[in-house]
From Swiss-Prot:
Residues 406-426 have a biased composition (Acidic residues). Residues 19-28 have a biased composition (Polar residues). It comes from the Eukaryota. Component of the Mediator complex, a coactivator involved in the regulated transcription of nearly all RNA polymerase II-dependent genes. Mediator functions as a bridge to convey information from gene-specific regulatory proteins to the basal RNA polymerase II transcription machinery. The Mediator complex, having a compact conformation in its free form, is recruited to promoters by direct interactions with regulatory proteins and serves for the assembly of a functional preinitiation complex with RNA polymerase II and the general transcription factors. This is Mediator of RNA polymerase II transcription subunit 4. The keyword Transcription applies. Belongs to the Mediator complex subunit 4 family. It is found in: Nucleus. Component of the Mediator complex. Residues 160-212 form a coiled coil. The keyword Lipoprotein does not apply. One of its GO terms (cellular component) is mediator complex. The lineage of its organism: Eukaryota, Viridiplantae, Streptophyta, Embryophyta, Tracheophyta. GO terms for biological process: regulation of transcription by RNA polymerase II.
Length: 426
């Protein structure tokens, strides 16, 4: 189970092994542990040789491995960095494994299997003594296995943190390589810029004799000679601007139009329209009906102000006509119902003759012969005459008096007309 969790090798994780250069063989004592002097010496040598095994970012964590020797309780073990914590956990697990042989009921079998001596774990490592266990004297294998599982879980967490640190170091190295490549590309670009600058300097030096001479300014002596001096010192290209030419061309094309067959010297155009649609034509188009359609675009105040009101006011509603005046104009078999107004549907009598087969709206209507229609009498003509209220009498046009003033001013022209005099008065 432990082999599946620990992916990296102990050397990469910073854990010292038997073949590492930092291994020191301490002087064993009667109890099998190194003395205090040898322990401090081995710790000092391990801290000095640790930078050769670990990256620069883990040197500080490796230097704190000596702090694990001062841990007096297993509760403080979680406060250590990942590397010293993993080392302390491995030492505790080694102690538990050694005690497992002592507590096992098959101790004699293990001794015979290992040829009279039980194996020792991490005995040759120059590591400080491990912190005390939660249960320093377990009495059964079950207690040892429960403590071993707890230590194994903590070891997995420490290894996970170490793996994250290694991933961050790999990412840091990758970023460093990218920065180095970018620096090399920037350096190459700077070299190209320097070469281009050198070439441009050479070109400027070569063509320094071919500079354009400055134009001499013409002083203006009098206001009368201003136009002549400006026309002699400037050209057409300096007088005209492209923006003005385009604006004038747009103005001509918008307001001037002639049919293709029009020739010079012909009569003036009548009814010709400019090529661009005018305002009234745009308002009569189908697109103008969708001007106020909400299509999801925000409506600004400027768009509301740009709305043009209708140039032609709608005609007033027609005045109510006197229906009694047209009663005598209708045939006797057609009766006008009460409340009927012009524009409402008309119900024709049933006795009207049907149109011939194949007749369509717009075809001529065959009327009955004139002999069958009785001519109305003169009294009927007078009675059928519409009332005078239906026709509006023509308005009286009043022309203002025109004063010609022929003899008052001698400087006036010899010829005058009514139109000219009326224009002057206006």
């Amino acid at each position: 189970m432990l082999q599946h969790q620990i992916v990296q090798s102990p050397a990469r994780l910073g854990l010292t092994g038997p073949g590492s250069p930092s291994v020191q063989n301490p002087t064993p004592t009667r109890h099998g542990h190194p003395t205090s002097s040898s322990s401090s010496q081995s710790q000092h040598q391990q801290i000095q040789q640790q930078p050769n095994l670990l990256p620069s970012s883990t040197v500080a964590a490796a230097s704190s491995a000596s702090a694990s020797a001062a841990v007096s309780s297993s509760a403080l073990l979680s406060l250590l960095p990942p590397l010293p914590r993993a080392q302390a956990l491995l030492q505790q697990m080694a102690v538990l494994t050694s005690k497992l042989f002592d507590v096992s009921p098959n101790r004699a079998i293990w001794l015979s299997a290992f040829r009279g001596s039980l194996p020792s774990f991490l005995s040759s490592h120059s590591l400080p003594p491990p912190p005390p266990l939660e249960n320093p004297s377990p009495s059964s294998t079950k207690e040892i296995l429960s403590q071993f599982n707890s230590l194994q879980t903590q070891l997995f967490e420490a290894v996970t943190e170490l793996q994250e640190i290694l991933d961050l170091q790999d990412a840091k190295q990758k970023v460093a390589r990218e920065i180095k490549s970018k620096d090399s590309s920037l350096l190459a670009f700077a070299n190209k810029l320097k070469d281009a600058e050198r070439v441009l300097d050479m070109l400027v030096d070569d063509y320094s004799d071919y500079r354009k001479p400055k134009r001499s300014k013409i002083e203006e002596d009098d206001e009368d000679n201003d136009n002549e001096s400006s026309s002699s010192s400037t050209t057409v290209s300096s007088q005209l601007k492209l923006k003005d030419i385009l604006a004038y061309a747009h103005k001509i094309s918008y307001t001037t139009f002639a049919p293709p067959e029009f020739g010079a010297g012909q009569a003036p155009l009548r009814g010709a329209l400019p090529p661009a649609p005018q305002d009234e034509q745009m308002r009569a188009s189908q697109l103008y009906t969708f001007a106020d359609l909400d299509i999801g675009l925000p409506k600004t105040v400027e768009n509301m102000e740009k709305k043009v009101e209708a140039l032609i006011e709608p005609p007033p509603p027609p005045e109510a006509m006197d229906i009694s005046a047209i009663h005598n104009l209708l045939p006797p078999n057609i009766a006008v119902p009460s409340g009927w107004k012009p524009g409402m549907p008309v119900e024709l009598p049933r006795d009207l003759p049907l149109p011939p087969p194949g007749w369509k709206p717009g075809d001529p209507v065959v009327l009955p012969p004139l002999e069958s229609i009785a001519a109305p009498r003169a009294e009927d003509h007078q009675h059928m005459r519409p009332s005078q209220g239906l026709h509006r009498p023509p308005d009286v046009i009043q022309v203002r008096a025109v004063q010609l003033d022929i003899l008052e001013d001698d400087d006036s022209s010899d010829y005058s007309s009514d139109d000219a005099s009326s224009d002057d008065e206006d």
